[in-house]
Amino acid sequence: MADSETLALQQQAERLRGWRDGFQAVYVITTGVQTGFFDQLAAHPQGLTAEELAQRTACHAPYVAIWCGSAYRYQLLDTVNGRYVLAPHVDSLLVGRAHPDSQAVLFLNAVREAGPRLARQADYMHSGAVGSHAEAYGTNPTRLDPPPNQEALQQRLWQAEMQSRVPALAAALHNGGRVLDVGCGPGLMLLQLAASYPNATFVGVDVVEVGGLETARRLIRERGFDDRIHLECVPAEQMTYAEAFDGVLITRVFHEIPVASRVGLFRACYRALKRPGVLLNLDFAYPDTLAEFREPLFWSGVDNQYREMSWGTVHPTWQEQQQMLTAAGFAAIERHFVRHIPQGTHYLAVANKR
């Protein structure tokens, strides 16, 4: 075997080993979240020994020592004077779930929900069986009781990524405008907008009750927004609103809409908008070309497509989305990449009704 061939083989072998290591790192992180190890280390910035960490979490000391070594190996922990401390930014990313960049819940979901499903992918390949997002949402604790960072993320998405691209909509909201949130789920974007624009009113639609509208109703009632946020359980393509809204939001849900319903959904959104009005659709960036499958901008979409294919997820390409928006009547369609989301890069489509 030529040296170049040996090198190439070893490079590929190292890549595969890295993926195996990453798999184990997911479980090291999840264990640290579930046991409270990260929380305790954040509460003691001077550091803890493995024995002290075991005592404070009522865990088996020899196993905790092994966990600390593994977490140090993955650069989740550092040491100061022989005591373990959190590595930089781990407190924001894995502790105290109010930070918009927190990934603690994503790791929990990966182990509790995605892992078992991915272990059955070979069976799905043979059977072609399809589940549903609604079934999964009804058992997902982050949908039933959303962690604080999810609201913080919605606030940042609006303020940092959306608001500046639709100044006319922002002005309308200040002056008592009206917005429709399609696929509103537990209502987190609605809550943020209602708090930011006290003169505006909002409507949220979804087809998921448990883990969706049921949670939204509770949160809206608790925040005292009952008089300004109305919820409706209806498939979005069956909405009958006509020139009723200044803006329509679809936030990270379009890939879940059945393919046969997508043009109908955009047409219903177009009818629902006043003239002028604007639609904002934020979703995973998915490749148009084979070359884009190897571009990091699109990896979150590629990974999500594989992870959710047995739920019936079909990610649209940008070209497909443009064609659907145009067929629905929208004009001046723009795409903006949004990178600062814990789940990875998304894109924001801005489409206008003129």
Task: Label the model's feature ranges.
Residues W19, F23, T31, S70-G177:
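Conserved Class I S-adenosyl-L-methionine-dependent methyltransferase catalytic core
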Residues N175-G185:
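Conserved class I S-adenosyl-L-methionine
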Residues P186-P198:
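Conserved SAM-binding loop of SAM-dependent methyltransferases across substrates and taxa
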Residues A195-A236:
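Class I SAM-dependent methyltransferase SAM/SAH-binding core
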Residues E237-V248:
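A short acidic, Gly/Pro-enriched loop at the edge of an enzyme's catalytic core
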Residues V263-R275:
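A short glycine-rich, Lys/Arg-flanked "PGG" loop and its adjoining helix->strand segment in the class I
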Residues A328-R354:
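Core SAM-dependent methyltransferase catalytic element
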